[in-house]
Swiss-Prot record:
This is Inner capsid protein VP2. It comes from Rotavirus A (strain RVA/Cow/United Kingdom/UK/1975/G6P7[5]). Residues 1-45 are annotated as: Disordered. Its main location: virion. The N-terminus binds RNA. It is necessary for encapsidation of VP1 and VP3. The N-termini of 10 VP2 molecules form a cylindrical hub underneath each 5-fold axis of the inner capsid. Residues 1-80 are annotated as: 5-fold hub. Belongs to the rotavirus VP2 family. It holds the Pfam family Rota_VP2.
Length: 881
């Protein structure tokens, strides 16, 4: 095409020179006529002889003919000189360029099974703490007392519901819940032991140290600590470790030990873990060269099929999943090798087309875009799009008949569903109106947009009516995936007539029938161009058969490594495919077989398994959190935050760009799913022990007492002088939750007006301020006025304040005869006192086992050399030499 342009400019220059010469000749003729008339009219006699100018003109004519022949030779030479420019300068514009999104690929490959995390400590909500004892006058005693307090007492500031605290606690438990516990890995030395014994973890050891050093600890307890050590039963592969735990923490850890996810691992399990189709593939040799020990363990991946049906009405989520799957699939599709030399093939095509300097432009376009990069890109795009079920769109030029004829092969081999409808219709319409209808002399097809039938389906009927027989290409209209469930996974399988390449032979018959038609309404050049294009493709029948088998084999081999159902729904965005790159693939495919290496297959399989397993675990977490929120009566809790957190933990989604309607639809689907048993049991454990957890917190009260008359502060051993009530004897009680639910505050108002204190019972947060004066100033405004006047209980925050020897206001009590009072009292139950004997537990686990996360590392795999490349029907993939 480049040499055409240059030739065209040379011809244009020649034409310009001719025009200039013609003008000069006209002027000369006029001058000659004038001179001739003058001579005729003049009476002078002149002798006429040959002028020197005429002799010069003859010489110039001879020279010009020589120059024209030289220019013609130059024009002919440009074809050879500029073939490379044809290939690289102009035509590479039509090559599809794929830019791999490295970040998405890295995110996918970085998803590792979370089972690999190693536990170094037991799970704990509580820890024992030493608290001082206060005398009646507010001074500290020298003795102290041990209480169980919350390890993470994190109630955020602001309007916060205690129920949300428990929801966050549950989320924390789910995050820290171990998949397996091996106590030997976390055991540490007991410093106070007589015989270098070990306790279960470092926190147990530090508690033992603190108790041992406490002066008030009994001698019997010290002696017991000195005896604390592990007990091994080697014959049963069991070890017992002493631990110091709150009874609730013990229940958690005992549950984790009893419900570990690890299972015994042996060679059979590993071999069966490999997809069956790869195990049975004669092109691969799989071998295991060692046995696993009896202590080998693994965690079975969670490969439940998609319970959310993300392909159904989740357009942006589905688009993201298919995009990431497409990028992953492209990275594992093998590169073509030993392709036909591009220059040699273009030269051969030029000879077949009998290209000359003055050949019509439509035939020179046949060579457009043919190069090995485009061929390889097309091969990878087709297989990766089918594996990820990404929709493709076709890009083509109607005047390039060769690319349209190549498109006929593409539509024969790749199911119609893989292309966006509008693009498929446009391509089929171009083929019908450019090749098929002109062959029979039929008028152009005018396709009505939105017609349920495709142009090919309409053409099939019209040609049968027009000519009495079709062109034998009806199979292209029935080219759909077959849905087959293999090993519990829905696979989109190519039809058997594609896999055994019968369709290629039928395609060739149809093309040959088209080339034999007369093209009655078209010029001869048009007919010749179409026939030559068909000839170019039919000359490579053997290679097309091999290419189709190669495409099908690579697709099906990689498909065996897909673990999630291959749902087919058209995607929002599409992968562009140039028909010129399809021409490159058809014309340059050689006879070298390429199949995925075993290492590539294993890598692809592992990444798919890890993503799928993580996906299911995150679904289980989200379902559990939603169920917990409902059970805790958090009706006003925004579920969108839970769904956003779920999507973030899947790594591949840009959560901020997901539309709200899809977020809420996702929430509704998550609500319908059942909770996984382990997560449900854990929540029930928390629910049963909410009272103990509230008691251990310094920020949660069990109620508030309000009155019109001031109530005196009372002495408390744990705090000094405080507005804390330890029991509700003598108070009228109202349930805080019922009050908030009904909104009827008349009962409280009546009681307060009758000077009767009211106790509102229920968990609620309280704030602490050490300045008594500022507290007394705030009290009426913050608590009393809100309940009686505004009647809003949901913002109630009872205020705890204390006056003791640690307080800034202790001097008020020490130096003055002043009795501090308050209109509110905080109802707070006493936390559980630490008792060494009740906190001492023995935990049992396996003495030793080894958890393997990468099962395929034990399998040595190789391809059969030389590659037999046998397809599903025991025929060689590449037969053509």
């Amino acid at each position: 095409m480049a040499y055409r342009k240059r030739g065209a400019t040379v011809e244009a220059d020649i034409n310009n020179n001719d025009r200039m010469q013609e003008k000069d000749d006209e002027k000369q003729d006029q001058n000659n006529r004038m001179q001739l008339s003058d001579k005729v009219l003049s009476k002078k006699e002149e002798v006429v002889t040959d002028s020197q100018e005429e002799i010069k003109i003859r010489d110039e004519v001879k020279k010009s003919t020589k120059e024209e022949s030289k220019q013609l030779l130059e024009v002919l030479k440009t074809k050879e000189e500029h073939q490379k420019e044809i290939q690289y300068e102009i035509l590479q514009k039509t090559i599809p360029t794929f830019e791999p999104k490295e970040s998405i690929l890295k995110k996918l490959e970085d998803i590792k099974p979370e089972q690999a995390k190693k536990q170094t400590k037991l799970f704990r909500i509580f820890e024992p703490r030493q608290l001082p004892i206060y005398r009646a006058n507010g001074e500290k005693e020298l003795r102290n007392r041990w209480y169980w307090k919350l390890k993470k007492d994190t109630l955020p500031d602001g309007d916060y519901d205690v129920r949300e605290y428990f929801l966050n606690l549950y989320d924390q438990v789910l995050t820290e819940m171990p998949d397996y516990l091996l106590l030997k890995d976390m055991a540490v030395e007991n410093k106070n032991s007589r015989d270098a014994g070990k306790v279960v973890d470092s926190e147990t050891a530090s508690i033992c140290d603190a108790i041992f050093q406490d002066e008030e600890t009994e001698g019997a307890v010290r002696r017991f600590i000195a005896e604390m050590r592990q007990r091994v039963q080697a014959d049963r592969n069991v070890v017992n470790y002493p631990s110091i735990l709150h009874p609730i923490d013990y229940a958690f850890n005992e549950y984790f030990l009893q419900h570990q996810l690890v299972e015994p691992l042996n060679n059979d399990i590993i071999f069966n873990y490999i997809p069956e189709r790869i195990r049975n593939d004669v092109n691969y040799i799989l071998n295991m060269d060692r046995n696993l020990p009896s202590t080998a363990r693994y965690i079975r991946p969670n490969l439940l099929q998609d319970r959310l049906n993300l392909h159904d009405n989740f357009e942006s989520l589905w688009d993201t999943i298919t995009t990431s799957n497409y990028i992953l699939a492209r990275s594992v599709v093998p590169d073509l090798k030993e392709l036909v030399s591009t220059e040699a093939q273009i030269q051969k095509m030029s000879q077949d087309l009998q290209l000359e300097a003055l050949t019509i432009q439509s035939e020179t376009q046949f060579l457009t875009g043919i190069n090995s990069q485009a061929a390889n890109d097309c091969f990878k795009t087709l297989i990766a799009a089918m594996l990820s079920q990404r929709t493709m769109s076709l890009d083509f030029v109607t005047t390039n008949y060769m690319s349209l004829i190549s498109g006929m092969w593409l539509l024969t081999v790749v199911p119609n569903d893989m292309f966006i409808r509008e693009s498929l219709v446009a391509c089929q319409l171009a083929i019908v109106n450019t090749i098929i209808y002109p062959a029979f002399g039929m008028q152009r097809m005018h396709y009505r947009n939105g017609d349920p039938q495709t142009p090919f389906q309409i053409a099939e009927q019209q040609i049968r009516k027009f000519s009495g027989s079709g062109i034998g290409w009806h199979f292209v209209n029935n080219n759909q995936f077959r849905q087959v469930v293999i090993d519990g996974v829905l696979n989109q399988v190519l039809n058997d007539n594609i896999r055994n390449v019968h369709v290629i032979k039928q395609l060739m018959q149809a093309l040959m029938q088209l080339s034999r038609q007369q093209f009655p309404t078209m010029p001869v050049d048009y007919k010749r161009s179409i026939q030559r294009g068909i000839l170019l493709l039919s000359n490579r029948l053997g290679q097309l058969v091999d290419l189709t088998r190669l495409l099908a084999y690579n697709y099906e081999t990689l498909m065996a490594c897909v673990t999630m159902n291959m749902q087919h729904v058209q995607t929002l965005t599409t992968e562009k495919l140039q028909l010129t790159s399809v021409t490159s693939l058809c014309m340059l495919i050689g006879n070298a077989t390429v199949i995925p290496s075993p290492q590539t297959l294993f890598h692809y399989y592992n990444v798919n398994v890890n993503f799928h397993s993580n996906y299911n675990e995150r679904i289980n977490d989200a379902v559990a959190i939603i169920t917990a929120a409902n059970r805790l009566n958090l009706y006003q809790k925004k579920m969108k935050a839970i769904v956003e957190d779920f999507l973030k933990r899947l790594h591949i989604f840009d959560v901020a760009r997901v539309p709200d309607d899809q977020m809420y639809r996702l929430r509704d689907r998550l609500r319908l799913l059942p909770v996984e048993v382990r997560r449900l049991d854990i929540f029930n454990l928390i629910l049963m022990n909410m009272d103990q957890i509230e008691r251990a917190s310094d920020k949660i009260a069990q109620g508030v007492i309000i009155a019109y008359r001031d109530m005196q502060l009372e002495r408390d051993e744990m705090y000094g002088y405080v507005n804390i009530a330890r029991n509700l004897d003598g108070f009228q009680q109202i349930n805080l939750e019922e009050l908030m639910r009904t909104g009827d505050y008349a009962q409280i108002t009546n009681m307060l007006l009758n000077n009767q204190p009211v106790a509102l019972v229920g968990a609620l947060p309280f704030v602490t301020d050490s300045s008594v004066i500022s507290l007394i100033a705030k009290l009426d405004a913050t608590v009393f006025a809100q309940i009686v006047k505004l009647r809003k209980v949901d913002t109630l925050k009872p205020i705890l304040y204390k006056i003791n020897s640690d307080s800034n206001d202790f001097y008020l009590v020490a130096n003055y005869d002043w009795v501090p009072t308050s209109t509110t009292k905080v109802y707070k139950q006493v936390p559980q006192q630490f008792d060494f004997r009740n906190s001492m537990h023995m935990l049992t686990s396996n003495l030793t086992f080894t958890v393997y996360s990468d099962l395929l590392a034990f399998v040595s795999a190789d391809t059969v050399e030389p590659i037999n490349a046998v397809a599903f029907d025991n025929m060689r993939i590449m037969n053509e030499l």
